[in-house]
Amino acid sequence: MNLLKIEQLDYSVVNTTDVSHIKEIYLKSKKYKGGTACEVGSLGGHGTFSLCLAGLNVTSYDNDGHKGFKDKRETLCKDFNVNWIVQEGLYALNDNVKYDVVFHDSYHFEEVIPELVAFWFYKVKDEGMLIVHDVETFSHERFMFLIGNPRFERTKDIHGRELGTYYKNK
């Protein structure tokens, strides 16, 4: 039922994460039902929606750089209690809250690596996971080295964009 809801979303906007990756985020996050998630970069709310369907309490950071999407994502997730924060994701690093799942789909390329490393060490709980969209845009080997080479999975969508999932073990 939830996978059908995800499939029925509008994926026509160019920068929207592909349906295969939104479903993957949902399926991987279900094991944390009742836990917490931090999303960095929401655009139309597809990732937020999948995390909510998985039963997580979601805090979403988005600076609304893509104007016109704030209302769309809030409408999509109106049946859930999402903590919407209109700020860049770096603001999440200002508190001591850790999350079961962190989904990062904000900005990309080499300059994102320090932010991802900070989220890994300071925001992902032990036994939690970091999910990153567009991992093909930066040096994966460098990122892996900096976070201690954890267990990970990478998948590619039909557009060639990659989703990386990194598992944090005690």
Descriptions of predicted regions:
Residues M1-D18:
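Class I SAM-dependent transferase core
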Residues Y11, I22-K170:
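S-adenosylmethionine/decaboxylated-SAM
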